[in-house]
Structures are given as C-alpha cells and as structure tokens.
C-alpha cells in the first residue's frame, strides 16, 4: 500500500482498498476540488480532509462510521426537549451560513478551509450538497451539511450554538430522510458525539457495498426542495 499522487488531468481515484492503515484510510493526495472530482470521490466512498497549508488529502477509512436513520438514539432527555422544542428546522434555506458555522466551530472547523467552502458551495449550486438549518426565532443556532448519493447521505460536519441544536438537526433530518426512502447516513469516522446518537462502525467493504446499491436509488423528486422540516413544538 502506498500513497497515490493524483493528477490534475484525470479525476480517477485508486481503489479505496489500497488506503493506508496508518494513518487510517489515507488514500491519495493532490488533484483539485472540482465538482467532477468531488462527485467521483463520493461515488467511490472517498472524501477530502486536510488542514490549512497541507496538500489536498483523500480518505476512505476502515472501519467506516454510519448511522441507519431509523436507529437514531433518542434519549429520554432529548425526547422531552424535542417535545417542547424552541427550534424550527429547515432544509436548504441557508447553505452558506451553515458551512460557515461549521468552519468557525472550534472543535470541527480547522479542516474546513476557504477552498473547501468554495467547493461545497459549487456542489450545492449543482444540487448535490445540502444543508439542514436549526433556527431559534430568526437566528441560526445549529445545522449540518453533506452530499447526497441517492438513498445515502454523506454527512460532512455539524455545529451547535445552543442547547441540543445539532442533535435536533440530525434527529429531524433522520425522520424526514427515512420517511422519503433514505437508508443510510455516512458519518465517516466515529466519535463520541455521533456514537451517542446511534452511529456505529462497519467494515469499509460493507460500506462500499451499501454505497454501490444505495447511490442508484432515487428519493422523491421534491425531497431536496427548500422547505420547513419541523416548525417547532406546537
């Protein structure tokens, strides 16, 4: 196994099975963040992740963290909170604000460079990247964004500026996604937060099998149209 240098003249990627074991999942470097290359990466179970000043690094870790949306872990305290939720949740109303919110989050944001922001803006404009927003009155207090692959959603990052805001984003999205035929959410690498919400590790080979099937599914035509997913507790 060796690290592959990508060409700027081809969007081809090596097989994810050739990724390094240490650091886990590092597959390639270089290339660019063009929409065509990013979409090719997601279709093959690969994603970019790098720090400012570093070359573009491409990853496909083993194991892979995933969440079956119908298995979202709703704790009793979160259930009580959601029943009285002060939040309104929307879809694709403020993609730019959400990715900027994720970029400014101290825990998650070091890797969301200006080039990443521009690249995912392009994917959003092309209808491939999507955001979920959590509002308290007219203030954005949390959200998440990711890339759609049929009935699989590749979650990229989330942020929270108020109690349970990011949990609310994921909970409401899981409910809407499941109801419309969504099957799986890619969480990339398991952490304490996503594990507490029901995410689990599966072998990379299994993830790639799910991806190859689910990316061929089609959600209802209007699923990604900007709309209100949750109006707040009534």
From Swiss-Prot:
InterPro entries: Acyl_CoA_acyltransferase, Leu/Phe-tRNA_Trfase, Leu/Phe-tRNA_Trfase_C, Leu/Phe-tRNA_Trfase_N. It holds the Pfam family Leu_Phe_trans. One of its GO terms (molecular function) is leucyl-tRNA--protein transferase activity. One of its GO terms (cellular component) is cytoplasm. Its EC number is 2.3.2.6. Keywords: Acyltransferase, Cytoplasm, Transferase. It is found in: Cytoplasm. It is an enzyme of class 2 (transferase). GO terms for biological process: protein catabolic process. It catalyses: N-terminal L-lysyl-[protein] + L-leucyl-tRNA(Leu) = N-terminal L-leucyl-L-lysyl-[protein] + tRNA(Leu) + H(+); N-terminal L-arginyl-[protein] + L-leucyl-tRNA(Leu) = N-terminal L-leucyl-L-arginyl-[protein] + tRNA(Leu) + H(+); L-phenylalanyl-tRNA(Phe) + an N-terminal L-alpha-aminoacyl-[protein] = an N-terminal L-phenylalanyl-L-alpha-aminoacyl-[protein] + tRNA(Phe). Its main location: cytoplasm. Belongs to the L/F-transferase family. Functions in the N-end rule pathway of protein degradation where it conjugates Leu, Phe and, less efficiently, Met from aminoacyl-tRNAs to the N-termini of proteins containing an N-terminal arginine or lysine. This is Leucyl/phenylalanyl-tRNA--protein transferase. The gene is aat.
